[in-house]
């Protein structure tokens, strides 16, 4: 466990690499539950009988459900996943599948990384490329230039390493309390209108067309 004296250092590492928030992509239909209960892991949602509009690929969800994390004794689906860079291959897939108008990106305070038991990966946690890190100080080892890349394809060639590293994750055990949610990001004013009555001014809503794919 990192020394409490060093607790601010990991957040500084993120800020110095252009990361102001941690992100989770979800369907707008899930907002009501998230605003009420916080953001829950897939397994905790199942345990509590919460209806969830799933956006992830079934095969990948099953793989994450079987992936046991080193040392913790828990599986990936026992954790809530957040991205450092939300405009990644996962975002591309779900935008093509559901249309960006139906999606919302949740932006969380960086203080989330201080929640006990939080784990970090330097690539998509379900991929064979991922390394798992249990100390916040190890964020210094991450290749932030690649993680913060704008694209994973150049000249028609897809670079697998870049694609996977852009999906590096923060894994929070079971639940992220509502207090850490700082803003909701939609792709259009039309989408904002869809969720305004639900949010009731309790969370900032922002429009960012460039975060989504079309």
Q: Where do the protein language model's features map onto the residues?
A:
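Active-site-proximal loop/hinge segments that shape catalytic or ion-binding/gating pockets
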Residues: 1-81, 87-214
